[in-house]
Amino acid sequence: MQDQYILALDQGTTSSRAMLFDRNGNVVSVAQKEFRQIYPHPGWVEHDPLEIWATQAGVAAEAVTHAGLNGTSIAAIGITNQRETTIVWDRQTGHPIYNAIVWQDRRTADFCDQLKAQGLEDEVRAKTGLPVDSYFSATKIRWILDNVEGAREKAKQGKLAFGTVDSWLVWNFTKHELHITDVTNASRTMLFNIHTLQWDDALLDALDIPRSMLPEVRPSSEVYGPTKTTVFASKIPLAGIAGDQHAALFGQMCTRSGMVKNTYGTGCFLVMNTGTKPIESKNNLVTTIAWQIGDQINYALEGSIFIAGAVVQWLRDGLGIIRSASEVETLARGVEHCDGVYLVPAFAGLGAPHWNARARGTLFGVTRGTTSAHIARAALDSIAYQSMDVLKAMEADSGIHINELRVDGGACANNLLMQFQADILGVDAVRPQVSETTALGAAYLAGLATGYWKDIEELQNQWKLEHRFSPSLPADQAKACLDGWQRAIRAAKAWADAP
């Protein structure tokens, strides 16, 4: 019998990707295609759902043919996706009734303020683990029902379907047969009770969203059904679904309570596995579902930082002090440390654990002796400081002391940043050999469901270290750095609060 592989589909915010993995978790083949970002008004962000499907189906076929294989070589398909992005389509025609409203879209911010004024925030947080925010799917669905002609009537008649991107892909891969999602994607809608594992009727009523629109919620690792499209000649089991950050946590094999990963991308996403019980955050973190395998649910705490790698793009595009992002490490190494210069990159407000929408980027401690190297160093340091703020909040909420931080994402290739991250945390930052942890997590979930891999223990043995960064900064110096950062954060907030 020929060797078989797992196909992971990674549907992201700017591109659709497909990756083939072998039994050792190695990448065999990759295909990627970008798609359009649509900005109808300031603060609005949309995608064309048909383009999402076309690009994802296209790269799926491409990754398989690139490797000289066909559908019979694929043991299972796992899906991971940009979370919260909202699609509503007509069940009969299969056509979207409006563009996908993307997670970044802020058009429903005023409606969220109304919900808070009605006193809904405590109920939403208690049931879903989420704050009331336009980031999540619920108010996006409501906007479509209120603003697309005939949508409300069709929804009442049961003619419309809602789904996050995973649901939309499965619906199309199964020729409109399966309307499902997994618990991780459901947990990001602001409509799913993470304790009962059911759609919450009281929240649906409060938002005036018919339950008939919603997909069936399934575990993250399960054989859902076979593909039925012409993308592949043979039927392949669809067997794993998880939102991107949940998949990355699983791909990093953070399978035990207290294990944490940080994905350093445009922003940072830190997720801590908190085991089988949800922990309510007292420090402005989000309580969410890590994954469900069989009957077992794992919960997580999550904190998101808006500006991480984006601060390096700003050094390049805004200040012009580097020509490419890869130059930042060399420039920053031109100084031993930041010499009292601190950059708080609150270009879009501050995310977790501060959640201050009015804060703006601020640069402190600048003297005549300050150079572009100091600013580059302060920019990199700011990524590590913001991550530390979230990790300290996670420790406070969970009562668990973090032993190490598993790192992934584009900016984790920056050795200077990773070393400083270890220095100020006082724990090791560990970088895996396989950096494609999100796609790998989706592959692992699908492979477990089909018996391609035996159990989680087998997968834990596949996790391989590429580099371990251990703290080397003396404790008194680390404390001085942290004190300066805390002063900078306080000053940035004071600036935001000024009349």
Swiss-Prot record:
Q: Which InterPro entries did the record assign?
A: ATPase_NBD, Carb_kinase_FGGY, Carb_kinase_FGGY_CS, FGGY_C, FGGY_N, Glycerol_kin
Assigned GO CC terms: cytosol
> Which PANTHER family does the annotation name?
GLYCEROL KINASE, SUGAR KINASE
Q: What processes in GO biological process is this protein linked to?
A: glycerol catabolic process; glycerol metabolic process; glycerol-3-phosphate metabolic process
Look up the EC number in the record and give it.
Answer: 2.7.1.30
The protein's annotated pathway = Polyol metabolism; glycerol degradation via glycerol kinase pathway; sn-glycerol 3-phosphate from glycerol: step 1/1
For the ligand (sn-glycerol 3-phosphate), the binding residues are T13, R83, E84, Y135, D244
Q: Which reaction(s) does the protein catalyse, per the Swiss-Prot or TrEMBL entry?
A: glycerol + ATP = sn-glycerol 3-phosphate + ADP + H(+)
Known HAMAP family for this protein? Glycerol_kin
Q: What is this protein called?
A: Glycerol kinase
Where does this protein hold glycerol?
R83, E84, Y135, D244, Q245
Residues bound to ATP are: T13, T14, S15, T266, G309, Q313, G410
Select a single GO molecular function from the record's annotations and give it. Answer: glycerol kinase activity
**Which amino acids does the record list as binding ADP?**
T13, R17, T266, G309, G410, N414
Q: Describe how its activity is regulated.
A: Inhibited by fructose 1,6-bisphosphate (FBP).
